[in-house]
A protein has these predicted regions:
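Membrane-active amphipathic alpha-helices enriched in small hydrophobic residues
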Residues: 445-453, 462-493, 497
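The conserved Walker
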Residues: 27, 31, 274, 303
Length: 499
């Protein structure tokens, strides 16, 4: 089976082979050449075959997926040109809208513990020393079973580690006060960018993205118009999502069709400024995640935006026009041309620069996993409405989504912040009790005389306020420790939880 996406001038239809869709792909081209339409058409094709999809909407123009398109203008011309079936070709799709900020979609959250120290270090833009300290903080939290759900948990954990630095030194290493301060300042910057919304509960359950409706895969659209203004937060979230899928999904080998497909727009942001250790791990995840039935499609202007180790794994390629005005542009054109299997009838280097809007150089993997010779083709028009729906329509669609009721409200569950505060309260009360005992001891005979006169408490006699506080805090801390220290937390390839 193929997901038909394009047609040549010789009426040859081209598409992605279903069993090769998890071999990943690339959609590249200059601004305004048709990348978003290609992305949309691919997402529709996967959905039609019951494959759930995740895609990023960085321009806010993909909400029209919920409505059928209209037989007018260029859409009507292309439908007739390619004999696609007229009005019956058009269709709306099952869509769930998501938004980290909770403004135009279902609130989308993860937790600090789930993101892990490696991706969080990138998010906070930490240097190697500061990253080392953050790893130490996570290790202490993991060993003690303290959950880091939101930013206040991380702040509390940093404070706890700093205040107890000497006790951790032998087992975990030195705790630099300067690094603690630097991380705290980075957290302030992150909060100013709106990251408070990203971390919390209920956190995303990936099963909610692996859904179908009436036999078609649900298209999960992440509104990123605002998120894209914080590139590190944008890239860290997408990398976390990739890692979560890799860790949570079972091995399926080579399925007849993918289990899930992701489209990462502005894909260069995943790698801009990333340390080599992170790039290496991303390359490893991309290589291994296909055995989980997941296909990843990178969308970017220039193929050179991606590391060679990642680019080499993208088997299904759609290359829209590139403009070759500068030496770097010319290098990009040549590089893009070299990634295609040659076709004696096409000069790829010359063709890339003169492709029209909606035209592309296309090469997909065949049944044996071999790239087909490059062809010049026209991308089929989307079945859904190209224009976005209104804000009112979108708001109504979001509230009608079955998942909205579960995710809409932030829940502040008990975690490291509460546990550490309770421990601090208990320590303060214990210190006060010690001081009182010392005072009684210093009182000497007067203390003994008091006990002789008034005696000790009888069974059932009411506790003092201080004794009640100590008892209550001790019980609360005990409950938290028993409930949280159930097993040592295990982390996977990008630092994400292994649940």
């Amino acid at each position: 089976m193929q997901y038909l996406l394009a047609q040549t001038s010789q009426n040859q239809q081209l598409g992605i082979t279903a069993k090769m869709a998890n071999r990943h792909g690339l959609i590249a081209g200059a601004t305004g050449t048709g990348k978003t339409v290609t992305l949309r058409k691919m997402a529709e094709a996967f959905s039609d075959d019951g494959v759930p999809v995740f895609l990023v909407d960085v321009k806010g123009d993909l909400s029209g997926l919920v409505q059928p398109g209209a037989m007018q203008g260029k859409i009507a011309e292309r439908i007739e040109q390619f004999n696609l079936g007229g009005e019956s070709y058009l269709s709306g799709y099952p869509v769930s809208f998501w938004d980290v900020f909770g403004e135009t979609g279902i609130p989308l959250r993860t937790t600090i513990s789930e993101m892990g120290p490696l991706l969080l270090s990138r998010l906070l833009n930490l240097n190697a020393t500061q990253e080392g300290l953050l790893n130490l903080v996570f290790r202490v939290a993991d060993d003690k079973g303290l959950l880091l759900i939101d930013l206040k948990d991380l702040r509390a954990m940093l404070k706890y580690v700093a205040e107890n630095a000497k006790s951790f030194q032998v087992e975990y290493g030195n705790v630099s006060a300067a690094s603690v301060g630097a991380i705290q300042r980075a957290l302030l910057t992150l909060e100013n960018e709106g990251a408070t919304n990203l971390f919390g509960e209920p956190a995303l359950n990936l099963d909610d993205w692996l859904q179908t409706r009436d036999g078609r895969g649900v298209i999960n659209v992440l509104n990123s118009e605002k998120l894209i203004n914080s590139p590190r937060m944008y890239s860290a979230f997408l990398l976390w999502l990739m890692a979560e899928l890799f860790e949570q999904l079972p091995e399926v080998g080579d399925p007849d069709k993918p289990k899930f497909v992701m489209f990462f727009d502005e894909a260069h942001l995943l790698f801009d400024g990333a340390p080599s250790v992170l790039v290496d791990k991303v390359e490893q995840v991309v290589r291994l995640i296909r055995s989980k039935g997941v296909g990843i499609y990178f969308v970017t202007q220039n193929p050179l935006d991606l590391p060679d180790t990642v680019l080499g794994q993208l088997g299904n390629r759609v290359q829209h026009a590139l403009r070759a005005f500068t030496p770097r542009d010319q290098k990009a054109v040549k590089s893009a041309a070299e990634t295609f299997r040659s076709n004696p009838n096409i000069n790829v280097v010359e063709t890339i620069s003169i492709l029209g809007v909606g035209q592309a150089l296309v090469s997909f993997l065949d049944e044996k996993g071999m790239p087909t010779p490059v062809e010049i083709a026209y991308i089929f028009p989307p079945k859904s409405q190209l224009a976005p729906i209104t804000a009112e329509q979108r708001a109504a669609w979001v509230k009608d989504d079955d998942l909205y009721a579960f995710y809409k409200d932030y829940v502040d569950n008990e975690s490291a912040f509460e546990v550490l505060n309770q421990q601090a309260d208990l320590a303060a009360v214990a210190q006060k009790q010690a001081e009182q005992a010392k005072q009684e001891e210093e009182n000497g005979i007067m203390g003994s005389l008091s006990r002789m006169i008034f005696g000790t408490k009888k069974r059932g006699e009411q506790l003092t306020v201080t004794e009640e506080l100590v008892s209550g805090v001790a019980k609360a801390v005990g409950r938290n420790i028993r409930s949280q220290i159930t097993k040592q937390i295990m982390r996977g390839i990008l630092g994400a939880f292994k649940k």
